[in-house]
A protein has these predicted regions:
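Short, Lys/Arg-enriched N-terminal segments with co-localized hydrophobic residues
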Residues: 1-3
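Short, structured motif recognition centered on aromatic/hydrophobic residues
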Residues: 23-27, 59-66, 74-76, 107-115, ...
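Extended, regular secondary-structure scaffolds
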Residues: 92-94, 99-214
Length: 214
């Protein structure tokens, strides 16, 4: 391993913005399928201590973990000093990359637009969707029967705000879970265990939400 990147003065320096951009560009150049991939982890592969002790002029190797347009998880190593893709492997279905913000917000949008979800809210007397907060959680453990093996999934729970500025976590919409298949980009089931009254108390602690302050 030779040749230090021009963006770094020491082999253990964190990646610069330009190095991260270079790594992504190299990945997309060598594999066109990554044109629309999302990345959950990009970091420097630190060199072996022995090698570092013997030579401070080392190549910079970047590890990227992400999800491609087919929702397959992958790991790749890129030599940004030589602008080469060293390795790329698909991640086993038994594991998966961290959820990306795009997936999380995508799950929220899919849930909010789902007709059965909206009907479940109406059954609870909830009609103003702007006051509903949806929180997607990992879909592992007991995987919904309608989600194919290997597909990426989230399960979403909901909370109801009494105003736009309210702390929604004080008012859970209980007994309602949306199972979202991220790979198929659809809600596969709305799990409804019956109506439970939403707590009425507010949880706002700003001056407008409290009559008196301690």
């Amino acid at each position: 391993l030779l040749h230090m990147s021009e963006n770094s003065s020491h082999p253990l320096n964190i990646l610069s913005a330009s190095e991260i951009s270079d790594a992504v560009s190299v990945l997309k150049k060598f594999n066109k399928d990554h044109e629309n991939s999302s990345f959950s982890y990009i970091s420097l592969n630190e060199p072996d201590k022995k090698l570092l002790k013997e030579n401070s002029d080392l190549e910079r190797i970047v590890k990227i973990v992400g999800v491609d347009k087919k929702s397959n998880g992958f790991e790749a190593e890129i030599n940004i000093s030589k602008k080469e893709l060293l390795t790329e492997e698909k991640i086993s279905n038994k594991a998966g990359p961290t959820y990306t913000l795009a997936e999380i917000f995508g799950a929220i949008e899919l849930t909010m637009k789902d007709e059965n979800y909206q009907k479940a809210l109406e059954k609870r007397g909830i009609k103003d969707l702007s006051l509903v907060q949806i929180d997607p959680w990992p879909g592992g453990g007991f995987v919904n029967k309608n989600i194919k093996n290997g597909n990426r999934a989230l399960r979403a729970i909901s909370f109801l705000k009494d105003s736009v500025k309210d702390n929604a976590y004080a008012r859970p919409i209980q007994g309602l879970i949306a199972h979202v298949d991220l790979t198929e980009k659809k809600v596969v089931e709305i799990e409804d265990h019956g109506v439970v009254k939403v707590p009425e108390a507010t949880a706002r602690y700003d001056k407008d939400g409290q009559e008196t302050l301690r």
